[in-house]
Amino acid sequence: MRAVVVHGPGDVRVDLLPDPVPGDGEVVIAMEWGGICGSDVSYWRHGGSGTAVLKHPLVLGHEVAGRVASVGRGVTGVEVGQPVTVHPAELVSPEALPERLAGRTNLHPRVRYFGSAALHPHTDGGFSEFRAVRADQLRPLPDGVSTRRGALAEPLAVALHAVNRAGALAGRTVLVNGAGPIGALVVAAAKHRGAGTVIAADLAGPALRIAERLGADEVRNLAIGDSLPADVELVFEASGAPGALGPVLHATARGGTLVQVGNLPGEPAPAALGDLVTREITWIGSYRFVDEITDALGDLAAGLDVDPLITHTFDLDDAAAALAVAADRKSNSGKVLLRLGGEVNE
């Protein structure tokens, strides 16, 4: 089978690998679509993502969907041809979490994640024609949800987890700072979950136009002099830019809540945080998701429209070009998809 493999900084190849065979409790998926995430771009450009550094070649990709190709022994309730997506996290240790983390499996210290070099050996992702997965990682696609849209269930789950961390949204005014793919999906998720007015802010006009199509009631283009709104009760920071923290905290109302969903850099960086104290702002981190991928599929089936986010599609063999477009701010890309194989559908 063909697979998109990163070998080091700037070195991504379409390699030929053995076709997988399902083991006990496993299913092989014939992949159809994959969405490129910022971590995929980082592995390609820098040979790592965050603290995870490549030590050997890695198949990229954790935003994927396809159809069941074969079923291993002991697997029930799964049919060949069934359209599915994948929960990309797999616990690899029986270590119990402390009580304060009950149910928060996204915070378990021993998790294998599709397309991640965090553990050794690394965990290959799903940018390949076939991938064997544990049956309990499958999430069947509801009727009416194509595999193309199903590939966006994982990033939508990240957005939904952030929304869940914020509490009830009904009728609230919400600011989303950073309208890249995750920020845009936070806009869509917040609006779908009943937020009143949703304001999106970014430095890029094309990203803001996508955010409008996903439900933003107002947009602020910071590159042309627009300012952030004042005294917003609930703010999502999705840019991950340390320089944005001061202005975003200042835009948060006294006693308000700031949900940090954009990954911040691991190295020290200057940031103006005084308002965090003087305004008694509740600053909440949001990391990946628990099982909001199931909720994401339900929302997609209920009409949450993610299509405006998809701006580019490439064939698997053109993965290097796809990564370059996803990495290039001048490309005005939203979500870049790879056609991985099968009878792909729009």
What kind of region is each of these model predictions?
Residues 1-3, 246, 290-346:
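C-terminal hydrophobic helical "lid"/dimerization subdomain
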Residues 20-34, 48-101, 142-144:
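Glycine-rich beta-strand-centered segment in the early N-terminal region that forms part
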Residues 1-63, 129, 341-346:
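Short N-terminal strand-loop motif that marks the start
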Residues 166, 209-282, 345-346:
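Glycine-rich cofactor phosphate-binding loops and adjacent beta1-alpha1 units
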Residues 91-177:
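NAD(P)H dinucleotide-binding glycine-rich loop of Rossmann-like/cofactor-binding domains
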Residues 81, 136, 142-224:
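Mid-domain Rossmann-like dinucleotide-binding core that forms the NAD(H)/NADP(H) cofactor-binding site
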Residues 257, 270-309:
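Rossmann-fold dehydrogenase core element
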